[in-house]
A protein has these predicted regions:
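Alpha-helix N-cap/helix-start capping motif
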Residues: 24, 34-37, 58, 77-81
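Glycine/proline-rich, positively charged
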Residues: 1-52
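Structured C-terminal cap/extension of enzyme domains
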Residues: 59-162
Length: 162
């Protein structure tokens, strides 16, 4: 199940998510992308093991794992797969401070990857990095120049672009 109210206009409340997980056999996890740590905490508290959680917010990987999320379903991982893996691996190895630091280092790039509607920034980033993922298709359009510069700067600062 994917809870992304910013895209759907509908927020799946914790009670509803848990009820669905208990009543529908093939609902086993939720991708949490509300940005609301209080709500996600309540979901985990009510789930009592019947529902796994994955972060759907690249800027909140560590906070969501700290309340029980099993990992992340990520936009960032398309551009920085090793770094995204390392954030999770360090956390699960018990190196929470290292994981937290890696999360902080990724924040500028995370912000840049979401400065326009997905997948515009991620496809642009991959093309800039030399991975030919093709052009954007209608109705998507090229990034605004200020946002493109923000993305380029973030990629450079993160060591992904020269």
């Amino acid at each position: 199940m994917y809870n992304v109210p910013s895209r759907t206009g509908c927020n799946i409340l914790p009670e509803t998510a848990v009820k669905l997980a208990k009543e529908v056999d093939n609902i086993v996890a939720i991708k949490a992308a509300t940005g609301n740590l209080s709500q996600e905490s309540k979901t985990m508290m009510l789930a009592e093991g019947c529902l796994d959680m994955y972060s759907g917010e690249d800027g909140l990987i560590v906070p969501l794992m700290s309340i029980g999320a099993k990992g992340v379903i990520s936009v960032l991982s398309n551009v920085a797969p090793k770094q995204t893996h390392d954030i999770c691996a360090e956390f699960f190895a018990g190196n929470v401070e290292k994981s937290r630091q890696l999360q902080f280092e990724a924040l500028e790039l995370v912000d840049a990857l979401f400065c326009e509607v997905n997948p515009i920034p991620v496809k642009t980033a991959l093309n800039l990095m030399g991975m030919e993922v093709g052009p954007l298709r209608m109705p998507l359009c090229e990034m605004e120049e200020a946002n493109l510069n923000k993305l380029k700067t973030a990629l450079k600062n993160y060591g992904l672009l020269k």
